[in-house]
Structure formats: C-alpha cells, structure tokens
UniProtKB/Swiss-Prot annotation:
Ubiquitin-like protein involved in cytoplasm to vacuole transport (Cvt), autophagy vesicles formation, mitophagy, and nucleophagy. Conjugation with ATG5 through a ubiquitin-like conjugating system involving also ATG7 as an E1-like activating enzyme and ATG10 as an E2-like conjugating enzyme, is essential for its function. The ATG12-ATG5 conjugate functions as an E3-like enzyme which is required for lipidation of ATG8 and ATG8 association to the vesicle membranes. One of its GO terms (cellular component) is phagophore assembly site membrane. The keyword Lipoprotein does not apply. The lineage of its organism: Eukaryota, Fungi, Dikarya, Ascomycota, Pezizomycotina. Disulfide bonds: none annotated. It comes from Chaetomium globosum (strain ATCC 6205 / CBS 148.51 / DSM 1962 / NBRC 6347 / NRRL 1970) (Soil fungus). This is Ubiquitin-like protein ATG12.
Length: 150
C-alpha cells in the first residue's frame, strides 16, 4: 500500500516540478549590469545612442566666457570678461581672480555663481557654464572679500 500511495503522489506532482533555475527565498539577488558581450538581446548600440554617448563628455565650445562682478567692498578688476577653457576646473578661475586682485594666500576670496552658490573647486567650468550661463552665454561669477551669501 505504501508503494501504491507513493506512485499516486508522484503522478499528481508532475505539474509541480521545481523551476529550471532554483530561486533562493529570502535572498534578493543584486541586479548586475550585463556587458555587451554577455547580452543576447542587445548586440550593438543604436546609432542615436552612439552619437549621444560620443558627445556626452564634450563641450559645445572649447572656451567659455566668464564675467566677474564684485560684491560689497570688493575691488573691481579691469577685465571683467575672460575666456576660460571649458575643461578647466573652477580652482583655475579662483587662482586667476586671486592673481588679478593681488590677494595674499592668507586672505580669503569668496566666489559665487549667479549670486547664489559657491561651487566646489573641482567643478568643471564647462559644466557650470552649461547649467548656469545667462542669456548672453556668460557664466556670472560674483566675488567678495568676505562671505556675502548664505
């Protein structure tokens, strides 16, 4: 009787076979990115995606125009419009302004974009220009000898 009951159970469970790849319950598997070589669906990037990726890291202009504006009692500089290479970091703008104002290393100079925020020194000037340029395509950099905003 035990053998007949066992055969009966086996024939009823044919539809309840385990999945081809077992799933571990209670453990989420992380979503890992697939490389192009491992993907069976996507064998090449579409043409428009390839063009977009090629242009993503570049800047539309090799140099951008930065306009300096003094705030408060900060002295004005002669050349308030300068061209800066798009790939330079913002610290090069700070160094240029320090040189023009003849500010010693011990004194502070505070720079702000559009009188709003002080960017990090490692920000790329081209990215700042792309996001915060004015209607004249100038990046407005206000400067002060003491904290002016915030």
């Amino acid at each position: 009787m035990g053998g007949a009951a066992q055969n009966n159970n086996l024939s009823n469970n044919n539809n309840d076979s385990p999945p081809a790849s077992p799933v571990l319950e209670g453990r989420d598997s992380p979503d890992l990115p697939l490389t192009m070589a491992a993907s069976t669906i996507l064998t090449a990037l579409p043409r428009d995606a390839t063009a977009a990726l090629a242009a993503a890291g570049g800047f539309p202009q090799e140099k951008v125009v930065v306009r300096f504006r003094p705030v408060g009692s900060a002295p004005a500089i002669r050349r308030d419009l300068v061209k800066v290479i798009s790939t330079h970091k913002f610290d090069s703008v700070v160094a240029y302004l320090r040189k023009m104002l003849k500010v010693p290393e011990t004194d502070g100079v505070f720079l702000y974009i559009n009188n709003t925020f002080a960017p990090a020194l490692d920000e790329v000037v081209g990215n700042l220009w792309r996001c915060f340029k004015d209607s004249s395509d100038h990046l407005i950099v206000s400067y002060s000898m003491s904290p002016a905003f915030g």
